C-alpha cells in the first residue's frame, strides 16, 4: 500500500464515524420497533434476535475502528502496512486481544447492563482472525459457514509477512468462562465474509450497501463471557434486566423477567425476592395482575399464594371472575374441580361465595330454555348442582341467598298436569322445611315466604304444616341471635392470619372456640346424629379455613374426632394441619403419636425428619439476622483504631498521628460493648431454637426405641450428633435411655463423656452428669468431674456446681471434708455469710429448722403477729434529731361512720386505725410543712389513703407530735402491729426508706394535690395490665417462698451479713 496523505486518513476517519452513527441508529430503530410491535408473550423469544442484530452491528463497528491505518513514518513502515493488509493469514495463531474490565458507571449500575469489552487496535488481519477464532471470542461469537454447518473450516495457508516497526504490546491471556445460553446468537458466516481487510473508500461504500447479516434465533455455539481486571473506557453496552430483579429466588412458573407483572413492578419484585414467603407482597402482585387483566400473571401468582393460603376465598374468587370474564371455561372447571371436593374433606372450600360462583357458572353453561328438547336434562343438572352446594355449605348462615335462589328455581319449573304440579309443590315444601330449621340471615323472610306458599295451596293444611315447623323455626331464630353475638366480633381478613401471640390473637382464638363449643352443644336440638355431625364438621372446616396457621385449633378439631372414635378423620385433620403449619411441634407430635398407634412407622420417621429439616434453616437465618443487628449496633469502625492498637502494643500512649490512644480505645470498647449487648440478648433466642431442635431429636429417639428397639434409637442419636444445632440435652437423654434400658452404666458414662468434650463449659450439663454419677454411687468419678469442671468454669457461673457438690458432701461426706470444702468456697465466694453455709449443712431436703426456729423466718413468712412483749425495733439512723416538732394545726373533723357493711375481725389489727396513727411514718413526721400555695382549693377534707377499700374514720383535731429521734424506737411497740411493723403501721424497711427521703423544706418545685395525682394514676391504661384489686381488710398468708437448688430462700443474705442469694 502506498504512502497515504494525512488528509486521506482524516477523510477515512470521518467516513467511519458516519458509518458508526448509521449502524447505531439502525440498531436502535430495530429494537424500538420490535418492542412496540411484539406482544408481551413473544418479547422474551424475539429479544435474542434483536440483541444478536445489535451485537453484529457493534462487531462491525469495532472492526472498523480497529482497522484505522496508522500514519506511516517511513517507507519501511508503509511496506509493513501493505504486508499486514494482505488477506492471507500467518501460520502462527493470532496474538491474543487485550481485554480489560470496565467499571460500570452510576447509570449502568441502575440498569444492570452487561459491559462488552472493547479491544485495542491490533492489525486488520488479527481482528478478522480473532472474530473467527472462538477461543479469543468475547461477547459476540462469530462462526464461519463451515463451522455452522458442521464441516471443518479451511485452515489458512502459512505465508511469512514482514513485521511492522511498531508492534502492539502483547497482552496476557484472558479467562473465558461459559456464559448463559440466553446470550444472543452468533452471526452467520456471510457477516464474516463481508468484513473487509482494508479500509479503502471503495470498500467503505460496499460495507454500507451490504445486506444485513443473517440473525439466528438460537445460538450456534456457547457464548463466552470474558472476565477482565483492568478498566478501559466503556464503548458498547448490551441491555439486560435490572440488577435489583436478579436474585437466587426464581420467578413463579409461567413468568419471565419480561412478564408485565414483573417488568412493571420492580420494587414489589425486589421486596418479594427478599422475602418470598410474604403473603402481602404476593397478594399485591396478584391484585395488580387481576386489575390489569393479565391472566397468565394472575394464575402464576395465585399458584404461589395458594401454597400457604389455599383456603383464602377472596383471591380465589377474583381469579374465577377473571377467568369467567375472559371466557376461559376450561380453567374455571379446573379450579372448581380442585377446590370443591364433595367428600367434605378439610380442604373443601368453606366460603359461601365460592359455592355461589360455582352455581353461577353452572347456570351460565346450562342455559334453560323452556320448551327445548333438553330442557329437562338442563333442569336436572342445575338441580343437582344446587343440592350439591347446599349439602356442603347449606349450614352456613350466609347461605340464605342460595336457599332462596334454589326455591325460586324450583318454583319456576313447568307443570303440565296435576301430577307435575303436586310433585313440584311437594318438592318446594321439603326445601322450605329444610331451610326454616337453619339459623340463616334471611330466615324470617324464608318463613314468611313459606307461610304464603302453604296458604296459597290450602289454608286448612297450611296450619298443620306451619304448626309442625314453627318450634324449629323459633329455635333457629333464637339460635341466629346467639350465633351473631358469637361470630360477628371475629375479624375476617383476606388471608388467613399468622399467630403473633398477642392478646388480640387470644381473643380471636377464644371466640372461635366459643363458636365451636356452641355448635357441639346442639343448640338447634337436632335429633339426627349424622346431620348434627355434618353441621359441626362444617363449622370446624370453616374455622380451620380462616385460622389456617393456628396449630391450637387444628389440635382442637382432631381431639373432637378422636373423642368420637373417628381416627381416620382425626388423622386427616392432623395431616392437613402439619401441611398448614410445618413447624408446629404440637401437630407433628400429635400426628406422630396417632400414626405410631396405627403402626405406621415410616410416616413417623418422615414426620420427625421433616420437622428437623424445617427448623434448621430457621436457626441459620436467625444467626444471620443477629449478626446484622450486631453490626448495626456497633456502628462504623472507629477511625485510627488500628494505629492505636499498634501503639498500645509497643507501649506508646500516642499513635502515629499524634492522637491519644486512650480515647480511641475507649470508643472501641464502647463499640464492642454495644455489639456484645445485642449478642447476649439475641443469643438467647438462638439457644431457644437450638434447644427446640434438640427436643425433636429426643422425641425421635424415644419413638425409635419404642417402635424398633434401642439399636434404632442409637442410630437416631448418631444422626443427631451430626446436626450443627445440637445441644447437651440430646447427650443426656441418650445416656439416660441407655442406662434405664440396658442397666449398663458404662455406656451411659461414655455418652456423657462424649458430650463433655463439646459442652465442658456448660454448667447445666456438668451438673446433670454429676447428678447421674452420684445417683449410681460413683463418687470417685463424680469427684474427678467436679475438680475438672471448677477449673474450666470460672466465676459466678460455677456457683450452681459448687452448691450441688456441697449438698452431696453435707449429706454423705465426713466432717473434715466438709470443712475443707467450706474453706475453698469461702475463697471462691467471699461475700457469703458463714451463717448461711452453716445452716445449709444442718438442713435436710430443704427443711431448715435454724431459719424457722432460731431466726424467725417462719413467722415472717406466715405473717404471724409477735406476742405482746417489749419487742425492740432496730435502731435506725437519727434522721429526726434536728427536726422540731410540728405545730398543731386544726383539721376538719370527719363525721363518724354509723354503720359498716362487714366489720373487720377482732383478732386482726386494722390497717388504718386513725388518720393520726396512720400519719406517724418517719417521712410524714417532719417539721412544719409550708402552707399550701392554693388555699382556695382546700374546700374539702383530705381523703384517706384507702378511701376506696375502708370506711372513713374520725380524724383527730390536731396532729400529735412526732416521736423522738433515735431512742423513740426503743419504746414498747404496740401489740396491734407486732415486731415487723413501725408505729405508723408500715413495714419497717419501708418506714426506714421513707425516713431517708429529704425534708419537705428542701423542695422548691410546684406543689400538686395528692388527689389530682392519684386520679391521674388511677386513669392510666397500661397495656397488658389492669388495675390491681383493692387490698383486703384481713391479712392472709404471704406467697410461698421461692425454692432454689435444694433449699428455701425466705430473705436476702444482707439481713445476716452476706450479699449473695439465699436465706442467709
From Swiss-Prot:
Annotated Basic and acidic residues bias: 899-910, 933-948
Molecular functions (GO terms): mRNA binding
Keywords: Cytoplasm, mRNA processing, Nucleus, Repeat
Biological processes annotated in GO: mRNA 3'-end processing; RNA 3'-end processing
Annotated InterPro entries: HAT, Rna14-like, Suf, TPR-like_helical_dom_sf
SMART domains: HAT (SM00386)
Pfam families listed in its UniProt record: Suf (PF05843)
Domain of life: Eukaryota
Chain intervals for the UniProt region annotation (Disordered): 34-106, 119-192, 888-985, 1022-1064
Keyword Thylakoid in record: no
Gene Ontology cellular component annotations, sorted alphabetically: cytoplasm; nucleus
Stretches assigned to coiled coil: none
Residue ranges of HAT repeats: 327-364, 377-412, 423-456, 673-706, 777-811
UniProt feature, compositional bias: Polar residues: 44-54
Job description of the protein: Component of the cleavage factor IA (CFIA) complex, which is involved in the endonucleolytic cleavage during polyadenylation-dependent pre-mRNA 3'-end formation.
Protein name stated in the entry: mRNA 3'-end-processing protein RNA14
